[in-house]
Amino acid sequence: MKTKAVGRLLLLALALAGFACGAQNVKITPLGSHAGELCDRDRATIFEDPTGVRILYDAGHTVTGGDDARLGTIHVVLLSHAHGDHIGDRKLKALEGGTCAAPETVSATPNSTTGEIAAAKNAVIMMIAPMAAFIGKKVENIRSKPTGACAQTGPDMVVPFPAACLAAVQLGGARTFKIANATRAVEIATVTAAHDSTVPRELLSEPERKNLDADGVSLTLGPSSGYVIQFTNGLKIYLSGDTGIHAEMKTIVSEFHKANLAMLNLGPNAVTGLSAAYAVNELIKPVAVIVSHVNEGATTDGKAKPNSRTAAFINLVKGRPVYLALSGKTMEFDGNAKCVAGC
């Protein structure tokens, strides 16, 4: 009897140890147009810290709006730049609509998917200051009340907030966020992205559109940015945003922030597969890579199509795993950027 009791206790201890280990993982869940695939318009990604802080990055076109059931709780909304496929001037008509290469979308004007989600989730709006002000105005239009700065009484912003609020930053700035009962906070820092940040005309007021049309110019909402998020388990993920390669991938992202996981945007307008692979292999040097923003229907049954640009990039990356940002598939990473589940 004593032997059986000891055995049961040992099994319980092992189970609890496994649970504790799992509880220390960061969960990363892409939200795309077609479940289990990496598709043309896919941008949105949710990050969940072990303490429960949940962050949405670049809502874009592949959510159905603030009521998308896949979102769950969102504490912080990040936006890399104001292009329509990131700020979300359109949204999914329905999940699985259209094809992976050409998802079916409808207009998200006048407020954008980013604005809709921030308002619906009472989220912190953390992004470059001109974009934060712009999204804050969209939230004001939805809620019929001004969007103020987030209250902060200590070194960290404590989430959730009772209403959407602004945590505007400049390039290079950072904020920290924690759940009320947590002992550690998640740090989010902005980093350089070599890209423009023009906002879609459809999201502007009629007078503003007319002013711009007179000279054939566009409105830019400050510089683009990427982010480095340091989670409480030690994982440091670099979110590239749309960018060409640049020296700060080495000096700031790798050497200063010491990012060990990279989520890299592809897309021929900003970066080629060859240059993106060079950035990974020679500049950022992460332990692992997640590939997103591929501007093609990159997969079939969750596998990269052999003749896709995405597959070509993966084949050029050396010495580290590359994971596809498959919609609805949650990946879990430990503090050393090892994928321990879902990859």
Report the location of each language-model feature.
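Bacterial N-terminal signal peptides
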Residues: 8-18
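Core dinuclear metal-dependent hydrolase active-site scaffold
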Residues: 21-70, 156-254, 332-343
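A cross-family glycoside hydrolase active-site/sugar-binding cleft signature
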Residues: 58, 240, 264-267, 291-293, ...
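Active-site metal-binding motif and surrounding structural segment of the metallo-beta-lactamase
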Residues: 52-56, 60-134, 141, 153, ...
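Active-site-proximal segments of metal-dependent phosphoesterases and phosphodiesterases across multiple
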Residues: 261-276, 280
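N-terminal secretory signal peptides that target proteins for export/translocation
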Residues: 1-5
